Amino acid sequence: MTTSSRTCPVPAVNGHMTHYPAAPYPLLFPPVIGGLSLPSLHGLQSHPPTSGCSTPSPASVETQSTSSEELVPSPPSPLPPPRVYKPCFVCQDKSSGYHYGVSACEGCKGFFRRSIQKNMVYTCHRDKNCVINKVTRNRCQYCRLQKCFEVGMSKESVRNDRNKKKKEPTKQESTENYEMTAELDDLTEKIRKAHQETFPSLCQLGKYTTNSSADHRVRLDLGLWDKFSELATKCIIKIVEFAKRLPGFTSLTIADQITLLKAACLDILILRICTRYTPEQDTMTFSDGLTLNRTQMHNAGFGPLTDLVFTFANQLLPLEMDDTETGLLSAICLICGDRQDLEEPMKVDKLQEPLLEALKIYIRKRRPNKPHMFPKILMKITDLRSISAKGAERVITLKMEIPGSMPPLIQEMLENSEGHEPLTPTSNGNTAEHSPSISPSSVDNSSVSQSPMVQ
């Protein structure tokens, strides 16, 4: 016997007791369960209650409503907005959080940590007051570290962080197990010095500009061309000096040294000028401080090569290469056994192997959380070769645009790069190959040492 205010109790479902009206089909269940039945969601939605219970009271209706709502998952609450940090206090790049006491980007955080943990001692080649921002931060390590201290980064935080990590059990193999051997470390240091002493960084230069044809493109601005060709000649001499300082380079035959220099000279020229790119002004700066915008670079002689070079410069920016990486990549471009007409390609390959290993280890130690950075940087050699091939063609077309003769060093070093024979008329009207007028020993009065520099 039931009353009008009583509902039919049901067994627990998934561990919960609840109340529902009687099932619409009570005769389908054995009488031994006392008229109780499991609720049918389908029945609840499409049939009114029938025999077994009277109309439920308002209190039981409230209970039913609550129980039904429990079976329907509530929509997820919206995620809180991502936390926005102030820009990096050191370089003004996008911050990834508070590191060692200040808001900092991943690059400056890692730089400060490595500098403190390894007790690095840096030197500034200017007045110890270099501008540090996200473009120039890799150009002077001394001033970057000083700025880290100035904005409040704490040495003690680095030491505490290191001790904490030592106590934590390692869940996976560390990515910082790459260690330089003494030989590779010495090789890396020699190449870094060779690069820095033959190519001053942007922060060491006193920039100056010119208004010559700055607003519109012309076929060739002869004033800019004269200045550019003068600077290009000096740059080539510096590249030869850089090559002579590479361990093992002067142990190669003179013919192979000349072959490698001619094949890679334009690669290194482009790589070097692109590291002096300033994206905010879209300009490039030469070694005497002359700063040209994109239009002026076109008019100075780059012509159709201009946009390719500026695109490559933009692609280098996210790699954040420092002087050591640029020097090693330049050395790998130069000492390459797949160049045409080498007398001893196997010996050249053997010299390149430690350069590749040094670059790989240096990149992995500098960027332990970016294991794919080494192949990314190495693949830039392919881009450089593609631009250089077009650059060699541009040198040939320039000969028809300039009123005088091509500066001999530019013609000898660039026009005779791989796949492009120099065009010098002979007495019978045919073209003949230049005899090499430039060699590593003829750039200055010193002779080429034939003793290997590697141990």
From Swiss-Prot:
Residues 154-182 are annotated as: Hinge. The lineage of its organism: Eukaryota, Metazoa, Chordata, Craniata, Vertebrata. Keywords: DNA-binding, Metal-binding, Nucleus, Receptor, Transcription, Transcription regulation, Zinc, Zinc-finger. This is Retinoic acid receptor beta. The keyword Zinc applies. InterPro entries: NHR-like_dom_sf, NR_DBD_RAR, NR_LBD_RAR, Nucl_hrmn_rcpt_lig-bd, Nuclear_hrmn_rcpt, Retinoic_acid_rcpt, Znf_hrmn_rcpt, Znf_NHR/GATA. Belongs to the nuclear hormone receptor family. NR1 subfamily. Residues 435-455 have a biased composition (Low complexity). CDD domains: NR_DBD_RAR, NR_LBD_RAR. The gene is RARB. Residues 88-153 bind DNA. A zinc finger (NR C4-type) spans 88-108, 124-148. SUPFAM superfamilies: Glucocorticoid receptor-like (DNA-binding domain), Nuclear receptor ligand-binding domain.
